[in-house]
């Protein structure tokens, strides 16, 4: 059964994912570090798992829990690269789907930007997340959900 796992520490589309999966039978797990603790109540199909605050603790837990039928939502290219061949789909919160062809290019870009920073340079970060970005993500996730439901 398909399950969505969210890298929840800095994901701006958690509410969208919850809303879009409410009537689908798809369960959602939000994985966060304790430093991002929330008392927010979620619907029955949503669970929250908290892990220690250590570096990459959330990532390690996601890798540990994920299976071939899962959809993982993350903006972390390193985590995505570990999951691309393990899970059904890995998505960015901008709606783009990571795959074995584009992940290496994204990792290379991340490495080059780190080298620029190491030398004292700067590069432009991502623009702020907008309502339009959220709509693009929602449309992309709905396409994925419909494809999965057709296969069931």
Curated annotation (Swiss-Prot):
Entry-linked InterPro entries: UPF0178
Signal peptide: none
Similarity remark: Belongs to the UPF0178 family.
UniProt-recorded name of the protein: UPF0178 protein SAR0734
């Amino acid at each position: 059964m398909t399950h969505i796992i969210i890298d929840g520490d800095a994901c701006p589309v958690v509410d969208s994912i919850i809303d879009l999966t409410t009537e689908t039978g798809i369960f959602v797990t939000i994985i966060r570090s304790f430093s991002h603790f929330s008392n927010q109540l979620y619907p029955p199909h949503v669970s929250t798992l908290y892990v220690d605050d250590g570096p990459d603790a959330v990532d390690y837990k996601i890798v540990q829990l994920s299976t071939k039928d899962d959809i993982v939502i993350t903006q972390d290219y390193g985590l995505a690269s570990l999951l691309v061949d393990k899970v059904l789909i890995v998505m960015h919160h901008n709606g783009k789907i990571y795959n074995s062809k584009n992940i290496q290019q994204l990792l290379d870009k991340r490495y080059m930007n780190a080298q620029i920073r190491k030398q004292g340079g700067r590069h432009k970060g991502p623009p702020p997340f907008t309502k339009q970005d959220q709509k693009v993500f929602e449309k992309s996730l709905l396409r994925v959900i419909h494809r999965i439901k057709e296969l069931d």
